[in-house]
Amino acid sequence: MNPNQKIICISATGMTLSVVSLLIGIANLGLNIGLHYKVGDTPGVNVPNENGTNSTTTIINNNTQNNFTNITNIIQTKTEEKTFLNLTKPLCEVNSWHILSKDNAIRIGEDAHILVTREPYLSCGPQGCRMFALSQGTTLRGRHANGTIHDRSPYRALISWEMGQAPSPYNTRVECIGWSSTSCHDGKSRMSICMSGPNNNASAVVWYGGRPATEIPSWAGNILRTQESECVCHNGVCPVVMTDGPANNRAATKIIYFKEGKIQKIEELTGSAQHIEECSCYGAKSVIKCICRDNWKGANRPVITIDPEMMTHTSKYLCSKILTDTSRPNDPIDGDCDAPITGGSPDPGVKGFAFLDGDNSWLGRTISKDSRSGYEMLKVPNAETSTQSGPVSHQVIVNNQNWSGYSGAFIDYWSNKECFNPCFYVELIRGRPKESSVLWTSNSIVALCGSKERLGSWSWHDGAEIIYFK
């Protein structure tokens, strides 16, 4: 082939490739236009509705590639309608307790940045359950951990984190600032309340949906405080128990009814309960029950029964002869429904809980009657109403060779069961005052939930070796 023929051949080949490329481009353009018309005519694709709560949103992303072909991605997302929680279901039958979560915060904190906390609890919402606690604004290994035995300081905050993890500066969310707290989800959004300030003039800030909604000043000038575990909501109404006044004498307790963070009604405590602190509340059958701490007199626990629809309440004492506060005397022959049963030393009380459901009633208490060590669950039928009621079943949660602490109730009200399954947590306190070789006071958490099966006991103690912190 001579040079002229080669040139003609190469030119012809180039022109052929150019024509083919042009035809491919025209075909792609036509296909892209056709796809756009088809998307516009499809009845299943809706215009985004930003005002509705039960809408379909369509997002069309046109991405231009290097070969000038437009690729259309269609993403459809549905937003579920948010509704207020209603406490219409009964409690589930419980024959024993199964492990739900254990964060091992102190063990992990020996070699990691774990926050110093106390007064922990769990609380659930439509998206799942989270752990909560009052942080001390420092880590276990931090120098500021010295002095964290004290309850109230400007450095404390209510934090929350994913259930099962240990709280660190990297995985926690600050809910509000303060040294006493409660928090609950109404089905639409979360309400959190924190108390802060000096003992003689503390105040509460109520947060709803991540924003401050209400402020409450002290009404007795003596450590305004609240539940230290979750509140409970019914049809948007969230009652919260608050106390202001002496810890060892008559104090001023109020039940405050909130809706979307705003006060709907305030009631002074009525009934036979003489002292109320640190209530543990749960809801079922449209009623909220709060089992509290009488820090003044009673080793039997006060019970507040709340009607959230009428926004009214009554109070009394747990009738059972099984005493559940610490310190406490030996269990008496008879309980008392209307008056505190005195006795026990040296500690005046500890936060605790119970589930009161006729034959399906369970009480929690420390195994030691004198100190915050060990923890057990006792099934006590009719504990709320019978002065003769005693245990028919028993399960060890923490053995008596290990420290416990506060305990409280919570329920995952969104678990789609035909009933509300009771759950509880136990605070496992480590450090001072019992273990003075370290400078800090902190805790880990263990949580369990009810089971219809009859499961065995095991000790879910903290497990950290304090000697490793020296």
From Swiss-Prot:
Molecular function in Gene Ontology: exo-alpha-sialidase activity; metal ion binding
GO biological-process terms attached to the record: carbohydrate metabolic process; viral budding from plasma membrane
GO cellular component: host cell plasma membrane; membrane; virion membrane
Amino-acid positions noted as binding substrate in the UniProt annotation, renumbered to this chain: 118, 152, 277-278, 293, 372
Enzymatic class: hydrolase
Intravirion topological intervals: 1-6
Segments on the Virion surface side according to the record's topology features: 28-470
Keywords: Calcium, Disulfide bond, Glycoprotein, Glycosidase, Host cell membrane, Host membrane, Hydrolase, Membrane, Metal-binding, Signal-anchor, Transmembrane, Transmembrane helix, Virion
Keyword Membrane on entry: yes
Binding residue positions for Ca(2+): 294, 298, 325
Pfam families xref list: Neur
Region annotation (Head of neuraminidase) ranges: 91-470
Cellular compartment(s): Virion membrane; Host apical cell membrane
EC number: 3.2.1.18
Disulfide bonds: 92-419, 124-129, 184-231, 233-238, 279-292, 281-290, 319-337, 423-449
Residue segments, region Involved in apical transport and lipid raft association: 11-33
Active-site residues from the entry: 151, 406
Annotated stretches, region: Hypervariable stalk region: 36-88
Keyword Metal-binding: yes
Cofactor entry: Ca(2+)
Complex and partners: Homotetramer.
Comment block on domains: Intact N-terminus is essential for virion morphogenesis. Possesses two apical sorting signals, one in the ectodomain, which is likely to be a glycan, and the other in the transmembrane domain. The transmembrane domain also plays a role in lipid raft association.
Family of the protein in this entry: Belongs to the glycosyl hydrolase 34 family.
Protein name: Neuraminidase
Protein source organism: Influenza A virus (strain A/Duck/New Zealand/31/1976 H4N6)
Source organism phylogeny: Viruses, Riboviria, Orthornavirae, Negarnaviricota, Polyploviricotina
